[in-house]
């Protein structure tokens, strides 16, 4: 992950991806690999994988990117394509993907 310099402006692009699993065990393996590898991509500030406590078999990836261009580059990357292809047959429907811009963001130095 890129460690921001103290003088860096905080300009975050946040992506959420929600997945409803048909095969939770196999899906978690795909998503965990994606998260670990994506954290090393240029412009990545953080990526977390969460499991819902209110909706069984629902998983959420939360990504924070240094800029909109870093996020776009990642979405066009081989790692993103590989993850999407690996999810084939593991979901009950398409993932819900949302893109946010940081309204109030703070990075700890």
Named regions from a protein language model:
Residues 1-46, 50-59, 66-76, 92-109:
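Short S/T/G/P-rich N-terminal loop/turn motif that feeds into the first structured element of a domain
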């Amino acid at each position: 992950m890129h460690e921001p310099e103290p003088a860096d402006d905080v300009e975050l692009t946040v992506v959420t991806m929600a997945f409803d699993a048909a095969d939770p065990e196999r899906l978690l393996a795909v998503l965990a690999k994606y998260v670990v590898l994506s954290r090393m991509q240029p412009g990545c500030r953080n990526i977390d994988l969460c499991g819902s406590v209110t909706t069984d078999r629902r998983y959420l990836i939360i990504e924070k990117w240094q800029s909109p261009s870093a996020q776009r580059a990642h979405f066009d990357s081989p790692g993103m394509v590989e993850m999407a292809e690996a999810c084939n047959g593991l979901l009950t429907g398409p993932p819900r993907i949302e893109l946010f811009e940081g309204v109030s963001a703070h990075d700890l130095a």
